[in-house]
């Protein structure tokens, strides 16, 4: 999947319609797994958003519940949570690769699933990586409440605008959001600077 994704990115760049330094990636469900894998195994993306997350050793086999853990063991052949499954998890677990990930990551999650992201979020945060999490109350895998959808879509646009274009919405209601994001950016001096676009 990653090879196909990167081929599409390369083609878009070759057409002259995308700046290779300003490529973003987003995904929900299996698409979020693709985002995570891409962040671990590629440095092509300058910003990312996931709407579900994550496949990490402890959370998948613990916080997803016993039925899901049993299914993951039986169908996907996931190792037990009590086993050392580092070799299995390393290619796909954000928590085990947090030191390598530089891409700013926004996690927009349903409250029924956010526990699955805590291991990755904590690892990225502890490594001082640019990561932010928002949890929508009363939501499930796919958002159903219009206000939550609107808030997430607006935040997606703002996140990509900030990290890919250096753009900030002057709306005073978003001041705290941009203060947080500037702090994330400023804490990572090795992130490439993006010139502001108006």
Segments and roles (model prediction):
Residues 1-198:
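Active-site-proximal cap/loop segments of hydrolase catalytic domains
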């Amino acid at each position: 999947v990653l090879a196909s994704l990167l081929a599409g990115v390369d083609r878009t760049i070759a057409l002259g319609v995308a700046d290779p330094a300003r490529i973003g990636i987003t995904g929900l469900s299996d698409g979020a797994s693709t985002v995570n894998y891409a962040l671990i195994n590629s440095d092509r993306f300058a910003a990312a958003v996931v709407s579900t997350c994550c496949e990490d050793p402890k959370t998948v086999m613990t916080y997803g519940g016993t039925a899901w853990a049993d299914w993951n063991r039986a169908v996907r052949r996931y190792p037990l949570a009590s086993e050392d499954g580092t070799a299995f998890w390393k290619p796909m677990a954000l928590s085990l690769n947090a030191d390598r990930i530089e891409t700013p990551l926004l996690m927009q999650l349903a409250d029924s699933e956010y526990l699955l992201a805590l291991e990755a979020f904590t690892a990225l945060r502890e490594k001082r990586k640019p990561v932010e999490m928002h949890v929508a109350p009363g939501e499930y895998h796919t958002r159903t409440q219009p206000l939550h959808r609107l808030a997430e879509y607006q935040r997606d646009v703002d996140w990509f605008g900030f990290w890919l274009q250096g753009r900030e919405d002057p709306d005073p209601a978003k001041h705290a959001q941009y203060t947080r994001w500037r702090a994330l950016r400023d804490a990572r001096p090795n992130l490439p600077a993006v010139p502001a676009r108006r």
